């Protein structure tokens, strides 16, 4: 086995990020169980959204892939395959991307003349087994958001042109971020994100000074700063890998399942996505804390992240949707 080495710019350590616990938790849980369905992060400009997302990708272990494979395919039992290790893919989707750039293109002329399927992979192929990040997803064309969500949910990307069809694996954690001042995502699209984290600018002056100082020190000497947090980074990486291995053994009681569904029902949440995601996220949080049984505290920690964006908006209502979820949780679970 050989290792592919690339020169990458230094990434700010995930464990060095101050505050924004809600966003960090949502990202960690999605990495533990990608079937949660990704996370939408909404918040003010300059609150560390992009920095945190790149930091979680940098924290993930290397993955084994077949050499020169365009889809990051995992090794099979074929002994003739040459295997290499690469960093977990972290793909940025630019706002101006076309459908062909995202999904890939089929060379129709080559297919007709040579009788072979000539496929040029897109960003979904590159993101397979990694993270696909869309900044300002609320400004992205709805049609493209639909494609991303469909692929993230099914784990497959299908490209069809002139009667020729190609399908490949596209399993990735979809992370979207945006500023609410620039417009909201349509409710039917927002509902398809597993979690919704809301982040705000730090108001505490002492905390603000700490953030500024830490970023300044990192920019002056990135290597020294990364070494300072290496031990904490390795500990968190080990914890995430352990949770990934443990999650299949985690159980949730029928009573808790019933109460989660009761919360969703009383909040008038459309469909069953809210129920499913809350169950999954609670299991992931239990696994993250090295437990095989879900406790009330696990559900309390994740339920707002899983449900706040699924509530119908009433313009006359003054209570925040997150507070509404938390209040009902306390009534039903106490």
Curated annotation (Swiss-Prot):
InterPro entries: AAA+_ATPase, CHLI-like, ChlI/MoxR_AAA_lid, Mg_chelatase_ATPase-isu, Mg_chelatse_chII-like_cat_dom, P-loop_NTPase. Its main location: plastid. Pathway: Porphyrin-containing compound metabolism; chlorophyll biosynthesis. Keywords: ATP-binding, Chlorophyll biosynthesis, Chloroplast, Ligase, Nucleotide-binding, Photosynthesis, Plastid. ATP binds at residues 43-50. One of its GO terms (cellular component) is chloroplast. One of its GO terms (molecular function) is magnesium chelatase activity. Its EC number is 6.6.1.1. It catalyses: protoporphyrin IX + Mg(2+) + ATP + H2O = Mg-protoporphyrin IX + ADP + phosphate + 3 H(+). Pfam families: AAA_lid_2 (PF17863), Mg_chelatase (PF01078). SMART domains: AAA (SM00382). It is found in: Plastid, Chloroplast. One of its GO terms (biological process) is photosynthesis. It comes from the Eukaryota. Belongs to the Mg-chelatase subunits D/I family. Involved in chlorophyll biosynthesis; introduces a magnesium ion into protoporphyrin IX to yield Mg-protoporphyrin IX. This is Magnesium-chelatase subunit ChlI. It comes from Olisthodiscus luteus (Marine phytoflagellate).
